[in-house]
Amino acid sequence: MPVTCGDMIVNVMNLPPFEAPVGVQIKRAFPGDRDKILRFIREHFHEGWALEAETALLQVPGTCFIAEEAGEILGFACYDVSALNFFGPTGVRQDARGRGIGRSLLLACLWAMRLKGYAYAVIGGGVLPQNRGRHVYSRW
């Protein structure tokens, strides 16, 4: 039986402009945000992603972005955690989905990867049917 990984390769030299949803701040996470971010991920997602995000927070510069509204975390996205050029993990709180937050977090990471000198990024599982973000990923 053939194995399908579902990874997607994205050309980061051809990205649309970055834009955050109205009222939402997308920012690079700092080590001081660690406890708040890890608590958010554990509450809304799972421990494995929290461990990966912690690795992203320890890198210099950090490779994790968060979306906040009124000081409350709505989502997160990381890159260069499991491998260089690799996007993820990422997640948006269920009640905040459908507002373009995931797209903005993705673009923040892809633009950061471009500025780091990458020409391409790998989105793990980007084309798998169960990936809620695959419709966004397929635009590039």
How should these model regions be labeled?
Residues M1, Q94, I123-R134:
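Conserved beta-strand-loop-alpha-helix junction that forms the acyl-donor binding cleft
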Residues M1-V22:
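Acyl-donor-binding surface of acyltransferase catalytic domains
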Residues M1-V3, Y137-W140:
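Conserved acetyl-CoA-binding loop of GNAT-fold acetyltransferases
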Residues I37-I41:
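Hydrophobic alpha-helical core bundles mediating ligand binding, dimerization, or RNAP-core interactions
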Residues V92, G98-M113, H135-R139:
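Conserved acetyl-CoA-binding loop-helix of GNAT-fold acetyltransferases
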